Amino acid sequence: MSRSTRSKERRENDTDSEDNSSETSNQERRRCRQGPPRPPYPPLLPPVFPPPTPPPQVRRTRGLQDLGAMKSVCPGTSGFSSPNPSAASAAAQEVRSATDGNTSTTPPTSAKKRKLNSSSSSSNSSNEREDFDSTSSSSTPPQPRDSASPSTSSFCLGVPVATSSHVPIQKKLRFEDTLEFVGIDTKMAEESSSSSSSSSPTAATSQQQQQQQLKTKSILISSVASVHHANGLAKSSTAVSSFANSKPGSAKKLVIKNFKDKPKLPENYTDETWQKLKEAVEAIQNSTSIKYNLEELYQAVENLCSHKISANLYKQLRQICEDHIKAQIHQFREDSLDSVLFLKKIDRCWQNHCRQMIMIRSIFLFLDRTYVLQNSMLPSIWDMGLELFRAHIISDQKVQTKTIDGILLLIERERNGEAIDRSLLRSLLSMLSDLQIYQDSFEQQFLQETNRLYAAEGQKLMQEREVPEYLHHVNKRLEEEADRLITYLDQTTQKSLIASVEKQLLGEHLTAILQKGLNSLLDENRIQDLSLLYQLFSRVRGGVQVLLQQWIEYIKAFGSTIVINPEKDKTMVQELLDFKDKVDHIIDTCFLKNEKFINAMKEAFETFINKRPNKPAELIAKYVDSKLRAGNKEATDEELEKMLDKIMIIFRFIYGKDVFEAFYKKDLAKRLLVGKSASVDAEKSMLSKLKHECGAAFTSKLEGMFKDMELSKDIMIQFKQYMQNQNVPGNIELTVNILTMGYWPTYVPMEVHLPPEMVKLQEIFKTFYLGKHSGRKLQWQSTLGHCVLKAEFKEGKKELQVSLFQTMVLLMFNEGEEFSLEEIKHATGIEDGELRRTLQSLACGKARVLAKNPKGKDIEDGDKFICNDDFKHKLFRIKINQIQMKETVEEQASTTERVFQDRQYQIDAAIVRIMKMRKTLSHNLLVSEVYNQLKFPVKPADLKKRIESLIDRDYMERDKENPNQYNYIA
């Protein structure tokens, strides 16, 4: 290998020597196993490495400052001094005597790194370097290296390597005394081999001479001893070195045996050290000052543990702790101690014990982290202290009973409202938890006492207090127990404790609470109390379900009182709307919008609102009519829209929607024909809501009514153009609404005696209309007509907006001054009831254009009427409202009958559709299918009549073999 290559290799090895020390050591081990390339001298024998047996050491190995001591033993080397310099000096002197015959001065070496020199006659031989790390045990023997001098005597790691060119070693040397080797740090500076190899022109000659000498010499391979420091004690490992003669049969060995006599601790060191430690422990236990430095005590424990005295040390420590704890038990067996004083005494003992064990553990920390940690069966020093305290203090039956009873007594006092020392409770319960007896010794009794206390309290307070007050008390108790859990109870008790309180104060009284106070809370709309009720019931298993059932029963009962009582018909719909708003608010605010309560409310409304068939539907229709009629000043357009939305919610619950349709259509016709509709937009909005809810078929006729009104406007435009070409006397303006009979309600025709001017105008319009639409028939509905009259009174002229019947009555007074009831009836032909309502509106209302004699609110037979010339009013145009015709029983029955007729048609159609599809069906299945298709309730008797009617009309027949089965007839 060239000089530049060797220099480069040395530089790289110097840079990486620290990081790759372990890798270098591994490479050297492999090199030893494989053996070096065959040199011209005899092969090297592999060294023997016995397992390391660290000797006992009392003092620590000195550092680099002992470098000079090694030099005095082995001149020309750098290293640490041996613990036994006399033996090492003798060994070195003996080696020198064998090698002083022909040795030259060793070149200066670096203080950090040594180099071994060897000669080779082959031109391919290369220099090899070895780095040794003082921190790891060296197991690789040093390899021979080239040297610049022809003959050298060098030392490898504190061991001399002898070379001789004349006299072979005949004597077998043994080191019988103790010998300790010190390793050299691989970071030491590398000696400059390149300068030594090139310093003399005779380097090649010297190398040849050295090779010649090596042929007749034996090489001593020295082993490396490295010092390991662990826990302050020095451990050394040695290897055996051997000589190998260059000639077979003349090999001599230098055997260095392992240490026979290891350094021992001074006599009585263990006893004296333990005595110091014992005194320190007793001082801690007695709360007196410690004579020794804590660091010194810690070091003493470390020294004892390092010399395998850990087991005995642990036993002694346990014994002294146990003796001290046993001595504490007598103070707790006094019967005269008060429970609180006893608890304070046991707490003080526990606190002292914890403080003592912390200090003791800090001194014996090395023992705790080495010996105890390696023995899994042994408890740590802290756990040992807990075991001893539990075994000798708390496990004492008298002490434990008195402790638990005292704790329970303090908790009971606090529950009764007394002030207690909560920090004392927290400390004692923490002690029980640390000693792992909390659940077995305390928690079970604590929960039993809790159940007993709250069971009695619940029974007592349920009888004495009202529901709102009781609910607040329960909530307060739950908050108190939660605070105890946070303050001094263990968190493992939380679930059991809260469940116990909830069960005794709530779970055992769910039904009683609801039966006693739910109705009053709902009636009085006590939102906060209802919220608390729901919150508490949600904590108990099954509580919400019980509350839900009572909620349903309340809605059904309260709603039934609204619907069933006929006296409340006038206010039924408004009360239903108010009740619905109330329960919605309770659900949103108190029940947190629970879907179960929402669905239960809907089912309850549907149940009670249909207990009275047809009537709710009729009243809802009339209520809508009152809100959509002109003159309603109760709400703005936005409020009217919201009100209609609420009505539609109630409308969803009723079964008889066809009844609603019949009455709604009747009222809508009046609003459209008489012009009493408050807003066309509101009318169409309501129609849109009905269509969305019930479908297009439900509103088809209602939509047709609006279309007729639009077409009538177009026809009247054409009629006015037609009237311009007609020679009609007078200045009467006629407006006619053309209605399709199928869309509008059925009205009973009433023949009346119209004035001749009106009759003439009717004929003109009839001629005009039939001329455009041949084949059609007009039927006049005089009950729906209205007029505008101009009247003159003493105060002045007025315009009167009146119905057709009112117009006919007022026009009679152009012919006379006074008329009786019979005379007016005969002249106008108006039906008696209608005439009485007409006269009542003219003579008994707010705008009294007629005067009645005798005076009174009702129209009686024999009454006479005269024109009130003294009539006064601040308005020019006055609308005289006709007395609202109260629907008689016959008229209501007529409307209901029409609804029933429509239902019959729907039932017949449903039966035919089902039989046509199924062909053959039993009676029960047919009835079930019909119920599923119909949208209104049907009595079984009515359904049976419809089946018999279809059989009579040959739509279906009974099966001849099975009378309970029907067959469809195609």
Curated annotation (Swiss-Prot):
Location of the motif Nuclear localization signal: 112-115
Broad class of the protein's primary localization: cytoplasm
Segments of skewed composition (Basic and acidic residues): 1-14
Modified residues (Phosphothreonine): T15, T106, T202
Lineage, top ranks: Eukaryota, Metazoa, Chordata, Craniata, Vertebrata
Protein name: Cullin-4B
Family: Belongs to the cullin family.
Pathway the protein takes part in: Protein modification; protein ubiquitination
UniProt keyword terms in alphabetical order: Cell cycle, Cytoplasm, DNA damage, DNA repair, Isopeptide bond, Nucleus, Phosphoprotein, Ubl conjugation, Ubl conjugation pathway
Record note on modification: Neddylated. Deneddylated via its interaction with the COP9 signalosome (CSN) complex.
MF-aspect GO terms: damaged DNA binding; ubiquitin protein ligase binding
Subcellular localization: Cytoplasm; Nucleus
Pfam family, one: Cullin_Nedd8
Native source organism of the sequence: Mus musculus
